Amino acid sequence: MKLKISFLILVLFSVFFAIEGIIKWFPASVNGKGHSSCTNGLEMTEEDFCKMLCGIDGKLRESKCVDHWCYCSQILFP
């Protein structure tokens, strides 16, 4: 049983890291004006603000903050 659980965890982590390596990340920008920061004055967490920026056009994208800068993935489901 422990072997099955360990194998399942290994497979899940492998899939996660494979997907992370496949996704292309692009700097988030508002109206095409440079790279957007994750910091905000809206009392939102950096992750939530970045997620809002990446989905502002209604397209489904992943988002992440790296060193307080927001990055968006390519459109996942056009």
Swiss-Prot record:
Keyword hit for Zinc: no
Propiece residue ranges: 22-32
Post-translational events: Contains 3 disulfide bonds.
Subcellular location: Secreted
Expression across tissues: Expressed by the venom gland.
GO cellular component: extracellular region
Signal peptide: 1-21
GO molecular function terms noted in the UniProt entry: potassium channel regulator activity; toxin activity
Keywords: Disulfide bond, Ion channel impairing toxin, Potassium channel impairing toxin, Secreted, Signal, Toxin
Keyword Protease assigned: no
Coarse class of the protein's main subcellular location: secreted
Coiled coil segments of this chain: none
Functional description taken from the UniProt entry: Reversibly inhibits potassium channels.
Protein's recorded name: Toxin BmTxKS4
Organism: Olivierus martensii
